[in-house]
């Protein structure tokens, strides 16, 4: 039963890491990356639809994203959604495809994005600490219900803390890696 608490916590830690990884992938680092467009929703026949379901997104060059709509009539809707997004990139529509040229990041923009990365990383650490708190509470409930002894509780708390420390180290590593990617010219 005690192992179930740790396993559940570790699974939740892994989910937090995956979520953070997706979040970092959507922060542009001056290079074209199809995941930059993951959050873009297009108003397609009145329904918000993810862009990647309406078009293929390719990276023909280091700083260019090429969006090829499956349905050519949706090109105006896609262009409208890209203009309304917070990407800060103006789409170039040639009638059959849309090109997004990713501008080089200025030093100021890099620093702003690095701050954003730190903030996202800190939020992920808070999520990890909340998971730890839930696991510790579950362990204490088991001890109160006499399912585990006090010694087992102490061991379990140490194991939970070690798993938490490992999860936070991984977040720190991911954050440092993304900051390095952003700040390297």
Curated annotation (Swiss-Prot):
A single GO BP: translational termination
Gene3D superfamilies to which the protein is assigned, alphabetical: 3.30.1360.40, Ribosome-recycling factor (1.10.132.20)
Subcellular location: Cytoplasm
GO cellular component: cytoplasm
InterPro entries xrefs: Ribosome_recyc_fac (IPR002661), Ribosome_recyc_fac_dom (IPR023584), RRF_sf (IPR036191)
Coiled coil regions, renumbered to chain: none
One Pfam short name: RRF
Function: Responsible for the release of ribosomes from messenger RNA at the termination of protein biosynthesis. May increase the efficiency of translation by recycling ribosomes from one round of translation to another.
Name listed for the protein in its UniProt record: Ribosome-recycling factor
Gene behind the chain: frr
């Amino acid at each position: 039963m005690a192992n179930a608490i740790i396993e559940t916590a570790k699974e939740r830690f892994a989910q937090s890491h995956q979520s953070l990884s997706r979040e970092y992938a959507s922060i542009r680092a001056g290079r074209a990356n199809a995941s930059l467009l993951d959050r873009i929703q297009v108003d397609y026949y009145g329904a918000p639809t993810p862009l990647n379901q309406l078009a293929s997104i390719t990276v023909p060059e280091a700083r260019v994203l090429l969006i090829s709509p499956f349905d050519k009539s949706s090109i105006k809707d896609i262009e409208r959604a890209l203009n309304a997004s917070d990407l800060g990139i103006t789409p170039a529509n040639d009638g059959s495809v849309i090109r997004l040229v990713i501008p080089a990041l200025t030093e100021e923009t890099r620093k702003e994005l690095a701050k954003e990365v730190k903030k996202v990383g800190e939020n992920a650490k808070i999520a990890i600490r909340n998971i730890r708190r839930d696991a510790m509470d579950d362990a204490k409930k088991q001890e109160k219900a006499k399912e585990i002894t006090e010694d087992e509780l102490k061991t379990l708390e140490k194991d939970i803390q070690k798993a938490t420390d490992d999860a936070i180290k991984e977040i720190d590593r991911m954050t440092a890696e993304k900051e390095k990617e952003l700040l390297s010219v």
